[in-house]
Design a protein with these regions (language model features):
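Conserved catalytic SET/PR domain of SAM-dependent protein methyltransferases, capturing the structural core
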Residues: 1-99
């Protein structure tokens, strides 16, 4: 069954901007949270997980390209242990996907 967000994450008001992603419980470093972007018909599409993340110059997460069990795309992984209630952020960059 498709789930737009992992069970460990919720969407709440953010002090950074608008809404953000927050940990509902502690999340260990190196945890793959899910896909944030994928390519469809030549277009880069954003998932719900990718839609609510905020930028930080000191992010708690990092994005990486991979072809995991759910398909090829940009995925999100924690860079360090995340505490309950902490906002999940990553560094926004422009990127071109070539498959």
């Amino acid at each position: 069954m498709y789930k737009p967000l992992p069970d460990t994450i919720t969407i709440k008001d953010s002090g950074i901007h608008g809404l953000g992603l927050f940990a509902k419980e502690e999340i260990p470093s190196g945890t793959v949270l899910g896909m944030i972007h994928f390519q469809f018909n030549g277009e880069l599409m954003r998932t719900p997980l990718g839609a609510f993340g905020n930028h930080s110059d000191d992010p708690t997460c990092e994005k990486f390209w991979d072809s995991l069990e759910n398909g090829a795309g940009w995925y999100l992984r924690t860079k360090r242990d995340i505490y309950e209630g902490e906002e999940l952020t990553w560094t926004y960059t422009l990127y071109k996907v070539t498959i």
